Regions:
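Conserved N-terminal catalytic core of the sugar/cofactor nucleotidyltransferase
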Residues: 1-7, 13, 30-124, 131-132, ...
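A structural signal for short hydrophobic beta-strand segments in well-ordered beta-sheet cores
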Residues: 22, 175-177, 272
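Short, surface-exposed amphipathic charged segments that create phosphate/polyanion-binding patches used
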Residues: 93-104, 168-173, 286-290
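Conserved core of the sugar-phosphate nucleotidyltransferase
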Residues: 133-223
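Catalytic beta-strand/loop signature of glycosyltransferases that borders the donor
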Residues: 218, 270-277
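Conserved nucleotide-sugar donor-binding
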Residues: 223-234
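A C-terminal functional module that forms or caps the active site or interfaces directly
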Residues: 235-268
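Hydrophobic helical membrane-anchoring modules
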Residues: 264, 269, 279-310
Length: 310
């Protein structure tokens, strides 16, 4: 069984000031998605599903997909690609969209867009985050171990200290889990940064307190492992969400919220998988030079070929 990689690439990139998913950062203009796909193929994945916005679908296909025409899976078969759009009006038929809403419905809604094209265990990632080789290996192994299972999902947790930006505070969901390494909840913390004294601090979004955080705390970078039964469970929660928030202009349906609902209802468990990989990405424009330098370093060290694709 070859897992599927689901890439969330519909984000607007407002803080960065452009479509981060299409920004060339590698030595030969490679995008972060290019590296994610390379790592996923090496980890045994067989299909890539992109979730994009309709207005840049064709540009996205031309810029990204043409690079992979010669990419083969581990078994020598061609890597499969599917493109799906996330649009505001893609909601259950019994609901009528508020015509004033412009904001996308959120990450969990984006995942639901792929329900008809994914029938195997799959991994969700952001299109503008670099997760590292070990993360894809760990997530791919989890998928293969859970083929045919239901109600057990996974989150790949990154050490908080491996996810900070030198250009400003970041928001991170801190993972809390029990003795069996099952997720209990994800608590969003805002404005996280390392202070002058070397201590990491941030604002707890639940209590409002400015708190000290451990550098080794595991946090979510939106890398999840799911089996196909997730779609039905999440779809039912989305309908309840719409019943309560249909007329809201800003409320979003996020993956951690859907998972939290399942955990509270006892309908699913979520394994917390720890990765040694360092995350990096372009949260702010000021992050870009450091990311470009990091990819150049990885190429010099032989971690990746250059160019990445031929």
């Amino acid at each position: 069984m070859k897992p599927t990689l689901l890439v969330l690439a519909a984000g607007m990139g407002s803080r960065y000031g452009g479509l981060k998913q299409m920004d060339g950062l590698g030595p030969n203009g490679e995008t972060i998605i290019d590296y994610s796909i390379y790592d996923a193929v090496q980890a045994g994945f067989g299909k890539v599903v992109y979730i994009v916005r309709g207005y840049f679908l064709e540009q996205f296909k031309e810029t990204v997909a043409r690079k992979y025409s010669n990419v083969k899976c581990c078994d020598g078969t061609p890597l499969e690609f599917v493109f799906v759009t996330q649009e505001l009006d893609k909601i259950p038929a019994r609901f009528t969209l508020n015509p004033e809403r412009q904001k996308p419905w959120g990450t969990a809604h984006a995942v639901l867009m792929a329900a008809d094209v994914i029938k195997e265990p799959f991994v969700v990632i952001n299109g503008d985050d670099y997760y590292g080789k070990d993360s894809f290996r760990i997530a791919g192994d989890w998928c293969r171990a859970h083929e045919g299972s239901e109600g057990v999902y996974a989150i790949v947790g990154f050490e908080l200290d491996h996810t900070l930006s030198e250009s400003g505070g970041v928001s991170r969901g801190i993972c809390h889990y029990d003795a069996e390494q099952h997720l209990t909840n994800v608590v969003e913390h805002l404005n996280i940064q390392k202070d002058a004294d070397g201590v990491v601090r941030g604002d707890n979004s639940v209590t409002g307190e400015h708190v000290e955080l451990a550098a080794k705390d595991l946090c979510s970078m939106n890398m999840w492992g799911f089996t196909p039964d997730y779609f039905a469970k999440s779809g039912a929660i989305f309908e309840t969400f719409l019943e309560q928030n249909l007329m809201e202009l800003k409320k979003e349906f996020y993956i951690p919220y859907a998972i939290d609902c399942m955990i509270k209802a006892g309908s699913a468990k979520c394994d917390v998988l720890s990765t040694p990989s360092h995350w990096f990405g372009v949260t702010y424009k000021e992050d870009r030079p450091a990311v470009v330098a990091k990819f150049a370093e990885l190429a010099r060290e032989g971690v990746y070929p250059t160019p990445l694709y031929k």
